[in-house]
Amino acid sequence: MFSETFVPSIFSYKHRLLHLSVLFFIVPYWYSYYNDQHRLSSYSVETAMFLSWERAIVKPGAMFKKAVIGFNCNVDLIVSGVRVVDALNTTCSEGKDQETLETLADLHQTFAHFFQRGAAAERYMSSEDQFNLLVAESEASTRSHHHIGGNAALMADRIAANFPSTEVYLVGPIGPRSQALLHPSVKRTNSTRILKDELHVILEYKQGEILGDWVAPSSSRFITSHDHFSGSMVVMEMFFKAIAQFRPDLVVITGVHLLEFQSKEMRQEKMRLIKRNLLQIPPKVPIHLELGSLADEIFSTDVINKILPYVDSLGINEQELTFLSHIANGPHMEEYPVQAGTVHVHKVVEMLHWLLKTYGRDPTGQIASKTGYRLSRIHFHCLTYHIMVSSGTDWSNLAAGLAAGARIAGRLSCNIGANTMDSELLEIRTPANFVLDKKIEKNYQFEAHNPIASWMREDVLFVFTPVLVCRLPSKTVGIDDAISATGLLYSQFYRLNRPTHW
């Protein structure tokens, strides 16, 4: 038998108050922990992902105060693509991608080409008469809707509505209807007002819709237009003049893809104008380029070489990324055109790494051929996942920007309110596990409560998240612009070196 002296004094009867206090601490702790685990396990996958994004979204220490955005603005006429194309009385035996549409038959062929792939695209209609016929047929549709359109106007509208502390100045051709549709706090210039709005016809279709012998594998849209002003020299000059006058701490340039349909001489002159003015913007002011649908290889090569290196940030989707890789001898050239579904993540990672390393800023400043290069951030978005890529130290808070963009993607498609969460309308479409980066053998294991993954490859940071996809989307147009604008405003930019004054 042990004597009482062997019993530690802490367990003696004299310390009963200590025992009770420890007990009163442990019991609530374990009860709270059990309840938290039980509550988390009771969430649906969709709700768990949404709450995880909410936790990741933190506003940057210094928000952008002033933004100048240009230069394409129009009114989107959104219609049922299948209904309108069927009503055109044209025939189409096979889909074929036309760089420029001259007739309604060309429209039918090109629409069918992308429809059977479920891929978004945009093409210019060279004949004003044919375009007016399409507009008349579209406006006669019982389900036509008018919305603000154009990448610049959509991004300005999104920032004004969701980031009231940021003053937004939009430069673009603004007609009477777009003037009424724009958010009232968006500042605009009278010098680019037009009497009649530019119209873009948005031919939307839903997954499972039938056009002739083809079935749409996913919901998407086809855009066509006959713009007069968005790519005009006057609008572009006013855009860069506004930058000098307004002195913003953020510049967003969009609509460059609309120059593709102009004469070679005209677009070369405008490309020189853009590059010359980009070089005059101080390095402390970030420039974001939102890319649009491209088809002409010569023009797109000019964009890659003459504009892309001289912006700080790029917004891009899978069609645009694979096309750039295809024409510039990048990795996985065979992925263009994108077929039904999305490109494997590890292939997109390879293309993004190539794009940033080839056309991005040299943090060391030792590569002479990259003098003046600024690109250090890419925000990639497709239907099922988003990736943020960055090099150097200029950009931070990137996971918050990625999560904020991912959070709104499916919600906008389904038209779900900001303060509601209807998980039945959304679904996850990525596998439970897959390869993120083959080169460094980085794998992804899906966890609904922690969907965001990040890793370094050489000096490049990657941040990845799957996205909740709308099962029955009510709209597809404008989602990319909203994602990019939201991700950009949650990102923080600060360049330490090369101080410059306006």
Curated annotation (Swiss-Prot):
Its EC number is 2.7.1.147. It catalyses: D-glucose + ADP = D-glucose 6-phosphate + AMP + H(+). Glycans are attached at residues 89, 190. Catalyzes the phosphorylation of D-glucose to D-glucose 6-phosphate using ADP as the phosphate donor. GDP and CDP can replace ADP, but with reduced efficiency. One of its GO terms (biological process) is glycolytic process. The active site is at residue 481. InterPro entries: ADP_PFK/GK, Ribokinase-like. Coiled coil: none annotated. This is Probable ADP-dependent glucokinase. Residues 44-497 form the ADPK domain. Disulfide bonds: none annotated. Belongs to the ADP-dependent glucokinase family. It is an enzyme of class 2 (transferase).
